[in-house]
A protein has these predicted regions:
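Terminal leader/tail segments of proteins
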Residues: 1-106
Length: 106
């Protein structure tokens, strides 16, 4: 995990706003938003700790890396990967793989 991703997760954990390089975290009363280059890529519901993931319109290596860092923190058994130019989400516990859908809850 990259340093910026550790900083991102720390900011979310402690509910602190953060803006570093191309990644920002904004904390609101009931939700925390994560943005990459200004595009929404993740939200954490502070009441339920549910994580919603988005591609922000860009299915890049960096977006995937940030999403996997978020999932390491908030959905540890889940991960995003790419096969034949398509994104998928896998559950490492069950082995289930589903197509990635922007806005899905993991």
């Amino acid at each position: 995990m990259r340093q910026i991703e550790r900083d991102m997760n720390r900011a979310i954990r402690y509910r602190q706003n953060m803006s570093k390089q191309n990644t920002s975290v904004r904390c609101y009363r009931e939700e925390i938003e994560v943005r990459l280059h200004g595009n929404l890529i993740g939200t954490v519901d502070t009441a339920s700790n549910q994580l919603r993931i988005f591609d922000g319109g860009w299915q890049t290596v960096t977006t995937k890396s940030r999403l996997n860092a978020l999932m390491d923190e908030f959905a540890p058994c889940m991960g995003v990967f790419q096969k034949n130019w398509e994104w998928f989400v896998s559950d490492r516990l069950t082995g289930q793989v589903v197509p990635f859908v922007s806005g899905m809850t993991v």
